[in-house]
A protein has these predicted regions:
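NAD(P)+-binding Rossmann beta1-loop-alpha1 motif at the extreme N-terminus of oxidoreductases
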Residues: 1-45
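Phosphate-coordination loops involved in phosphoryl transfer and adenosine-cofactor binding
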Residues: 2-4, 84, 147
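Rossmann-like NAD(P)-binding element
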Residues: 47-98
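General beta-strand structural signal in soluble alpha/beta enzymes
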Residues: 52, 122-126, 175-177
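Short, conserved loop/helix-junction motifs that constitute active-site signature segments
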Residues: 79-85, 118-119, 142-144
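Rossmann-fold NAD(P)-binding glycine/threonine-rich loop
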Residues: 91-141
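Active-site-lining helix/loop region of Rossmann-like oxidoreductase modules
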Residues: 145-266
Length: 266
């Protein structure tokens, strides 16, 4: 039986994830906080394997529930409806958009924060450490020499296997980064976060040339061995969290131009 991916969030990342899922033959139920009617154009582009639904409908239908959301949105997630579900946590902590004292004090990781709210769900961290464009463009079929390895973290082996199989199906090899408590090793500021999956933009380009290069240039593959080494050598960053200033300027310019005001504010 074909599995269904329920997606809560239909922005840049949610749209890229939905495209990868339908390309791999998964059914997708895409939702957002504004209602199914606001996703009709995207769903039409995605084809017959995708449909729009309410958040509750996406949760009910999904074998995996993906959260391509700002971290600040986690408290609005319906914990009761998500009970028993495997949740793919794609959120990241960026304090300039939303601040949390427990995260700042290293009391827990961002995925532990999500798991605490979704106390009866099984949270797996993954598909969070690159942007929407490269999430889609870096995907490769099994056996391709350019296939990338990405990390996951979580506390439940069965849920990890389910998510790992999904990620392999949509174009990635997977390395286990440990528990949610250890997921700081793959959070913003860690060696495996973002930069290995984005192209290096050369000096001397105009702003438009930088953007085009960033979107179109090939990225060298991250092998499983390289991914493991990056995870193992990670040192917990302090202060914690990502910043736009630490990102490639071309990425920031494209993100701010395309992202919704709701995303930027959070």
């Amino acid at each position: 039986m074909t599995q269904t991916i329920g997606i809560i969030g239909s922005g840049l990342v949610g749209g890229a994830l939905a495209r990868l899922a339908v390309d791999a033959g998964y059914n997708v139920v895409l939702s957002n906080s504004r209602g199914p009617e606001t996703i009709s154009g995207l769903v039409q582009e995605l084809g017959p394997l995708a449909r729009a639904g309410t958040v509750d409908e996406a949760i009910a239908a999904g074998d995996i529930i993906a959260l391509p959301l700002p971290l600040a949105s986690f408290e609005a997630l319906p914990a009761d409806k998500l009970a028993g579900k495997v949740v793919l946590d794609q959120t990241n902590y960026y304090p300039e958009f939303w601040r949390n004292a427990e995260l700042d004090n290293l009391a827990l990781t961002s995925s532990e924060l999500v798991q605490r709210h979704l106390k009866d769900s099984i949270v797996i961290k993954g598909l969070h450490n690159f942007d929407w464009n490269h999430m889609y463009s870096n995907a490769r079929p099994k056996g391709d020499a350019e296939r990338m390895t990405i990390p996951v973290a979580g506390d439940d082996d069965d849920a990890k296997r389910l998510v790992t199989q999904f990620l392999k199906s949509i174009g990635y090899d997977v390395v286990d980064a440990g528990s949610l408590a250890e997921s700081w090793r793959i959070e913003p500021g860690a060696p495996i976060y973002f930069w290995p999956y984005a192209p290096v933009v050369p000096d001397g380009l105009t702003e438009d040339e930088e953007k085009r290069h960033y979107l179109e240039a090939p990225v060298p593959p991250v092998t499983t061995e390289t991914a493991r080494k990056m995870i193992d050598r990670a040192v917990r960053p302090s202060p914690v969290g990502g910043t736009l200033a630490s990102m490639p300027p071309a990425h920031v310019a494209i993100f701010l131009a395309l992202a919704s005001g709701n995303t930027v504010q959070k």
